[in-house]
Amino acid sequence: MSVSMAAGQLADFRRCSTAEEYFILLDVDYDPRVLAVNRLHILRYFANQLVELHDTRTEAGNPVELLREYRDALIRSYEAFTTASALDHRLFKVLQDRAPQSSFVPASSITVERLTPTVPQPSAPSDPVEPSQSAWPHHAAASADYLGGTR
């Protein structure tokens, strides 16, 4: 690819507005299902990769080389979400705020409390319940007897 052609492609890159446009322009294969589910996460990851790339660069560089680095960054971004989930990367604040907390308990903080066994005391025998009486009467006559009323 010539430098002038790459410069034109860089101008097109700056006008991209969808994830698909980036993938097509940089000639990166993708599964539309993966992109549909992880679109925002891939684009955020890609943006972070580009910031890192530009922070480490000291000069503008050759447009051909820059496009190659952009392509590599997009491939890394896409592959990051084919091998792990959005929850694994936690790129967005809402996911960072809900990050799992550590559940570590040091062994030194565990104590054992030994209880002395108690022997149950025998209880007084209860009054036998007549078969016609029950704790939950099932009809109105039994209910009146149970509540102390008359039939």
From Swiss-Prot:
Organism superkingdom: Bacteria
Keyword entries, A-Z: Nitrogen fixation
Residues passing through the membrane, by range: none
Any single GO BP term: nitrogen fixation
InterPro entries according to UniProt: NifW
Pfam families associated with the record: NifW (PF03206)
Region named Disordered: 115-151
Subunit structure: Homotrimer; associates with NifD.
Task of the protein: May protect the nitrogenase Fe-Mo protein from oxidative damage.
HAMAP family found in the cross-reference section: NifW
Similarity remark: Belongs to the NifW family.
Protein name as it appears in the record: Nitrogenase-stabilizing/protective protein NifW
Protein species of origin: Frankia casuarinae (strain DSM 45818 / CECT 9043 / HFP020203 / CcI3)
Encoding gene, per UniProt annotation: nifW
